[in-house]
C-alpha cells in the first residue's frame, strides 16, 4: 500500500478558504443588512439578491448573528439589525463611545493627581509631627481655646464610640427658649467637662438621667441658696448693736470643673437658656443687705409665757411689784415673734410627696390609678357611733372619700 505524500500548496492567485463559501456569503449578507432601511431585511429578497440556491445557508448565518445578539427576528422571514434601530445609529454611537473613552481617561488622570497630592500631604504632616523641635510645641492651652470662643459656653465631652448626641428644637414658654443636649451611650460612661468656668458664676450642676436615689431623697443638696443675714426688727436693737460689715460673697480662684458621669444605658442632659446667665445671679447675691427698721413689737410665744409664769411664785411676785412701781411700760422690753419649727413640719405621705414633686413633668394614667387605689384616697374611717333615726345624717358612704367631699383636682396635678 503506497503512502500518500504531502499535499502541494495551492497555486498563487487561488482564493483562500475564508473568501469563499459560507465566509464570503456572510460578509455579503452583513453588507446587505447594513444597507437595508431601518435595518430590516427580508430573507427572501436577500436570497434572490445574493443568488443563493439553498436558503439553509442564509438561516445558518441568521442563527449565528442572532445568537451573538446582533440581529433579532421581526417575523418568520424578516430580521432587524439592532445597531440601526431608533436612536441607535451606528455613527452616533461610535462618536458617543469616543467621548466616553476620552472622559474616562481624563478622570483617571485627575484621580492620579489626587492620589499624588494625598501622598504629599501625608508626608508633610509626618514631617511636622516627627520633628524634634515641633514635638515640644504640639499642645493648645486653656486660654487659647477660651479666647477663640469668647462669650460661648464650652463643654468637653468624652464618650465611647457609638454615643448618640441630640439637640432638640427648643420650645420655650413666653418667648424664652431652653436649649438641651441629650447624650446616650450603651457601651460605657460619658464624661462632660465645663471648659470655660468663670470664677464669678454660679456652680453648674450636671444631673444624670435618671437621677440617683440619693438625689431624689435629698433634693436640697443639689443647689442650696446661701443664708440671708437676719435684719433687725426693733429700733432699740439697732441702737445697741454696732454697725456690722456688709457681707459679700468671695469667689474661689482657679478654674472650676464639672464632671457628669453616666453608666451604660444612661443619659446625661445639660440644659441652659439664653436668658439664664450665671453672672446675674452672682450680682444679685453680692448686693449688700442693709438693716430694715420696723416700728413694731412682736409678741412673745405663748409657750414661753406659760413656762415663765409657772417657773416660781417668788419671781412672779417680784416682777409684779416692779411692774406696779413703774409709771409706764418698759420701752426696753422686746418680744420675739412666733417662729415655726422647721423640724416640726408635717411630712406628707409618700404618694402625696410624689404628686407635689416639682421635678415631675407629667403623670401617667397608671400612676393615677395606683394612687387612687392606695390608702391615701381610701374611704374615711367612721369614728362616731352609727346615727339614729332622729339624727341629722351628713356622712360619707363607704365608697366615698376625701375627693368626694372636697373639690380636689387630682387629674390636673
Swiss-Prot record:
Q: Does the keyword Cell cycle apply?
A: yes
Motif HCFC1-binding-motif (HBM) per record, residues:
389-392
Q: What tissue expression does the UniProt record report for this protein?
A: Found in all tissue examined including heart, brain, placenta, lung, liver, skeletal muscle, kidney and pancreas.
Where is composition skewed (Low complexity) in this entry? 307-327
Location of motif DEF box in this chain is 48-85
Which residues carry the post-translational modification N-acetylalanine, per the record?
A: 2
Q: Which UniProt keywords apply?
A: Acetylation, Activator, Cell cycle, Cilium biogenesis/degradation, DNA-binding, Nucleus, Phosphoprotein, Transcription, Transcription regulation
Drop me one GO molecular function for this one: DNA-binding transcription factor activity, RNA polymerase II-specific
Ranges that cross the membrane: none
Q: Where is the composition biased (Polar residues)?
A: 234-249, 293-306
- SMART domains, from UniProt? E2F_TDP
Q: Which SUPFAM superfamilies match?
A: E2F-DP heterodimerization region, Winged helix' DNA-binding domain
Give a yes or no for keyword Cell cycle in this entry. Answer: yes
What does UniProt say on post-translational modification here?
Differentially phosphorylated in vivo.
Span list, region Interaction with RBL1 and RBL2: 390-407
Q: Per the record, which residues fall in region Transactivation?
A: 337-413
Phosphoserine modification sites are: 384
Q: What does this protein do?
A: Transcription activator that binds DNA cooperatively with DP proteins through the E2 recognition site, 5'-TTTC[CG]CGC-3' found in the promoter region of a number of genes whose products are involved in cell cycle regulation or in DNA replication. The DRTF1/E2F complex functions in the control of cell-cycle progression from G1 to S phase. E2F4 binds with high affinity to RBL1 and RBL2. In some instances can also bind RB1. Specifically required for multiciliate cell differentiation: together with MCIDAS and E2F5, binds and activate genes required for centriole biogenesis.
What is the similarity comment for this entry? Belongs to the E2F/DP family.
Q: By what name is this protein known?
A: Transcription factor E2F4
Q: What is the lineage of its organism?
A: Eukaryota, Metazoa, Chordata, Craniata, Vertebrata
Gene name for this UniProt entry:
E2F4
